[in-house]
Amino acid sequence: MEKQKLIDMEGVVIESLPNATFRVYLDNGCIVLTHISGKIRRNYIRILPGDRVKVELSPYDLTKGRITYRLRAKSSNN
């Protein structure tokens, strides 16, 4: 049986919910409910509202996803 391909998207965390769950506003305008992946949980990476993240979505349910990476904030040079 072939494994289904996941949909990778980027977005911004807009709300932090209980149990390591977040509401993310994707670049295409959708809002999805996400949880964090095991590697992020294991390495104690903090995710806060306003952070830019990469999200994996299942093709079966596009309203739920998994945060796989927290993108670095752009540094401003003075």
From Swiss-Prot:
PROSITE patterns: S1_IF1_TYPE. CDD domains: S1_IF1. SMART domains: S1. Residues 1-72 form the S1-like domain. GO terms for cellular component: chloroplast. InterPro entries: NA-bd_OB-fold, RNA-binding_domain_S1_IF1, S1_domain, TIF_IF1. Its main location: plastid. GO terms for molecular function: ribosome binding; rRNA binding; translation initiation factor activity. Keywords: Chloroplast, Initiation factor, Plastid, Protein biosynthesis, RNA-binding, rRNA-binding. Disulfide bonds: none annotated. The keyword Plastid applies. It is found in: Plastid, Chloroplast. One of the essential components for the initiation of protein synthesis. Stabilizes the binding of IF-2 and IF-3 on the 30S subunit to which N-formylmethionyl-tRNA(fMet) subsequently binds. Helps modulate mRNA selection, yielding the 30S pre-initiation complex (PIC). Upon addition of the 50S ribosomal subunit IF-1, IF-2 and IF-3 are released leaving the mature 70S translation initiation complex. Component of the 30S ribosomal translation pre-initiation complex which assembles on the 30S ribosome in the order IF-2 and IF-3, IF-1 and N-formylmethionyl-tRNA(fMet); mRNA recruitment can occur at any time during PIC assembly. PANTHER family: TRANSLATION INITIATION FACTOR IF-1, CHLOROPLASTIC. Belongs to the IF-1 family. This is Translation initiation factor IF-1, chloroplastic.
